[in-house]
């Protein structure tokens, strides 16, 4: 059994152990600045992953998106052009969860401290951490600049959105026998056709105004019976708060 993670580098895909389902397939172009907490993680060459602004100086993302140097781009809609109001801030600290497992993607969560605080406005704002875990069938919003097709590559300039429900723990485990830990949940449509995928990794799953998930991994994007798998943010509230307080 092998899962694969796919990172896009200038149009080329590099397969690594573990599969990252980090794009939006079957979604729609988000209305401009509908998702003001969404950030793009840039490696100096291109967009690599998504993330979420949770305070004026901290971003939440996936641990498998880690790079030694990252620039956080806020207030973006079209990531290929400057539209006005964007803020580009280098990362000061990039902190992966100490128990992150790159083989199983358990604890796939990371915090990024910005070198300077973001200026909060209508284009750049924070998303709330959850007060409790999301319930089955909760409707959530997933967003990102990832691949928009299941086969091949078609990466959008404009931020894409997808509304999808949280699936039951039993159906999630049935879709991925032996691979789902208590720190993961599935979201999407078992019939396929709509999903997150390559390029959306690290991005937000927001339910009722709270960030409940981080785009983590999956099988072939939008494949029947293989929904996207997300990091369960509600399990990490203490770690998030302690890490921010200590850094």
From Swiss-Prot:
Regulation of this protein's activity per its record: Activated by autocatalytic cleavage. Cleavage by CTRC inhibits autoactivation.
SMART domains, A to Z: Tryp_SPc
Residues of the Peptidase S1 domain: 24-245
SUPFAM superfamilies in the cross-refs: Trypsin-like serine proteases
UniProtKB keywords: Autocatalytic cleavage, Calcium, Digestion, Disulfide bond, Hydrolase, Metal-binding, Protease, Secreted, Serine protease, Signal, Zymogen
Molecular function in Gene Ontology: metal ion binding; serine-type endopeptidase activity
UniProt protein name: Trypsin-4
Organism: Rattus norvegicus (Rat)
